[in-house]
């Protein structure tokens, strides 16, 4: 991906911001992974302290997409760890945004993928397979729909109804 500046995107797309087609997530996410800047079409998951669907999704070809995981904001366990970070890298995912925690931070930071999460927790999640895929999720003060576009850099995270020109 070419360098994409979220601040510039906001400055040059005032109309999209005013009509709600371009939205910024609240600045609550910590930055992990080697990609500080990433973007792609969104695939959504809604899970709670269970990462079976996360693994299942990351086992598919990412084709430059971004997996957005609504983990309910739980800080009690991690939904993504080093193995899943490596899986995301190997399968061509551009990034992962977790409304929840990660673990194996050093391993994730070695992966060529962008990861944003609320924090880290060494506890693993349950493995029951509960959750939903391709559903609207509400994260960081923003409604996010499957198929929208996500743009992330060191300044923040934007959600766009359509792909923006870089």
From Swiss-Prot:
Divalent metal cation. GO terms for biological process: regulation of RNA metabolic process. GO terms for cellular component: plastid. Coiled coil: none annotated. Signal peptide: none annotated. The keyword Phosphoprotein does not apply. The modification N-acetylalanine is found at residue 2. It is an enzyme of class 4 (lyase). Substrate binds at residues 81-84, 103. Its EC number is 4.1.3.17, 4.1.1.112. It comes from the Eukaryota. Its cofactor is a divalent metal cation. Keywords: Acetylation, Lyase, Metal-binding. GO terms for molecular function: 4-hydroxy-4-methyl-2-oxoglutarate aldolase activity; metal ion binding; oxaloacetate decarboxylase activity; ribonuclease inhibitor activity. The keyword Metal-binding applies. A divalent metal cation binds at residue 104. It catalyses: 4-hydroxy-4-methyl-2-oxoglutarate = 2 pyruvate; oxaloacetate + H(+) = pyruvate + CO2. Belongs to the class II aldolase/RraA-like family. Catalyzes the aldol cleavage of 4-hydroxy-4-methyl-2-oxoglutarate (HMG) into 2 molecules of pyruvate. Also contains a secondary oxaloacetate (OAA) decarboxylase activity due to the common pyruvate enolate transition state formed following C-C bond cleavage in the retro-aldol and decarboxylation reactions. NCBIfam families: NOT-MenG (TIGR01935), PRK09372.1 (NF006875). PANTHER family: 4-HYDROXY-4-METHYL-2-OXOGLUTARATE ALDOLASE 3-RELATED. Homotrimer. This is Putative 4-hydroxy-4-methyl-2-oxoglutarate aldolase 3.
């Amino acid at each position: 991906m070419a360098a994409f500046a979220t601040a510039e995107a906001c400055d040059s797309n005032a109309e999209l911001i005013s009509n709600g087609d371009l939205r910024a997530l609240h600045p609550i996410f910590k930055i992990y992974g080697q990609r500080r800047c990433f973007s792609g079409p969104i695939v959504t998951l809604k899970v709670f302290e269970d990462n079976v669907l996360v693994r299942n999704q990351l086992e598919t070809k990412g084709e430059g997409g971004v997996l957005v995981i609504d983990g309910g904001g739980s800080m009690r366990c991690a939904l993504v760890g080093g193995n899943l970070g490596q899986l995301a890298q190997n399968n061509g995912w551009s990034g992962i945004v977790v409304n929840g925690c990660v673990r194996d931070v050093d391993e994730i930071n070695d992966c060529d993928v962008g990861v944003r999460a609320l924090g880290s927790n060494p506890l693993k999640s349950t493995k029951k397979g509960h959750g939903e895929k391709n559903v609207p999720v509400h994260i960081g003060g923003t409604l996010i729909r499957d198929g929208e576009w996500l743009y992330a850099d060191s300044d923040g995270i934007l959600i766009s109804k359509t792909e923006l020109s870089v």
